[in-house]
Each structure stands twice: as structure tokens, then as C-alpha cells.
A protein has these predicted regions:
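N-terminal polyanion-binding entry modules of DNA glycosylases/AP lyases
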Residues: 1-28, 34
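Nucleotidyltransferase catalytic core that binds NTPs
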Residues: 25-153
């Protein structure tokens, strides 16, 4: 999908207004792991401003290399480490993620950080995910080099 296709899809999605009133942990895989079978969920958070082929390729490679069943993309709501920087509105970044992953059956998107409001901290999101999914779901946190550089902060 080209950047122009993504922009056009975002425009269409904004025009249609998805109507979500509550945060969705997952949009496609909300019942993931509820059957009791062992499974692996990759978690890929980021600003995604914009999401691009590099993000998608890294996620797919991690899925293959780690034997992950699905990857959950989580666009940040109010990223504390990007204060003072200009970033696209969260609703636009969420729509871009939805458009970018739409054709991959192993990818899903979550709006939990955006819906939560306030400052966005990864630990809060991971706690929410751990509480949502049953113990048979192994969580794998995937991070880019830019995120790893801020871990000590």
C-alpha cells in the first residue's frame, strides 16, 4: 500500500467514523487465547507517525522468527518522550495503522493507549494486556531502536 493509498484510506475512515465508544484491547483478536491453548502475542507499540513498511516488515520478521501467532500494534496516545514535538493527531495515527494492517490476517490494532487519555506509559499498557489475556497467552514486547534508547528514562 502506497503512502497515497494510506492517506486516502484514512480520509475515508475519518469520514465514516468508526464509532468506537470504548477502548478495544484488540479489534480482531479480542478473544485470543480464551480457548486455553498456548499462544504467543507480539506487542508493537509506537507513535506510528506515520506507520510505514519498515514497521510492518519488522513485525512480520519478529512473528516468523519468534513463532508469534499475532502482532498487536498499539499507537501511543500522548507519548511522554515526544513532548514538544509535532506529531499527527492520535485519531489519524490510529486510522493509518488500521489501513496499513488491514490486509494482514496476523496483525491487529488496539486503541487502548489513545482511549486511556493522559500520558502514555508502556508499563500501564502491558499491565492492562496481561490482565486482559489469560495466562496461556505469552506476551512478547517488540521495540524499535528509538524506543530502546529511552528505556533508562
Amino acid at each position: 500500500m502506497s503512502a497515497i493509498d494510506v492517506i486516502e484510506t484514512v480520509r475515508k475512515m475519518r469520514a465514516q467514523e468508526t464509532g468506537y465508544k470504548e477502548p478495544h484491547i484488540c479489534e480482531r483478536f479480542d478473544d485470543f487465547g480464551k480457548d486455553g491453548k498456548p499462544c504467543r502475542l507480539g506487542i508493537m507499540g509506537g507513535t506510528f507517525d506515520p506507520i510505514h513498511n519498515g514497521h510492518l516488515a519488522c513485525a512480520e520478521q519478529a512473528r516468523e522468527d519468534l513463532g508469534l501467532d499475532v502482532i498487536l500494534f498499539i499507537p501511543t496516545g500522548n507519548p511522554v518522550f515526544k513532548r514538544g514535538q509535532r506529531i499527527a493527531p492520535a485519531s489519524d495515527r490510529l486510522a493509518m495503522c488500521r489501513a496499513a494492517i488491514a490486509d494482514n490476517p496476523y496483525f491487529d490494532v488496539s486503541d487502548i493507549e489513545i482511549a486511556r487519555g493522559g500520558d502514555t506509559y508502556t508499563i500501564d499498557t502491558l499491565r492492562t494486556l496481561r490482565g486482559h489475556f489469560p495466562p496461556n497467552v505469552e506476551l512478547y514486547f517488540l521495540a524499535g531502536a528509538d524506543a530502546i534508547a529511552t528505556v533508562s528514562k
